[in-house]
Structures are given as structure tokens and as C-alpha cells.
Curated annotation (Swiss-Prot):
This is 44 kDa immunogenic protein. The lineage of its organism: Bacteria, Pseudomonadati, Bacteroidota, Bacteroidia, Bacteroidales. It comes from Porphyromonas gingivalis (Bacteroides gingivalis). To P.gingivalis hemagglutinin A.
Length: 8
């Protein structure tokens, strides 16, 4: 993946 999706 081009970026890591994070939930904050």
C-alpha cells in the first residue's frame, strides 16, 4: 500500500 491508514 502507498500509505498506512490509521484511526486516531
Amino acid at each position: 500500500a502507498p500509505y498506512q491508514k490509521r484511526n486516531i
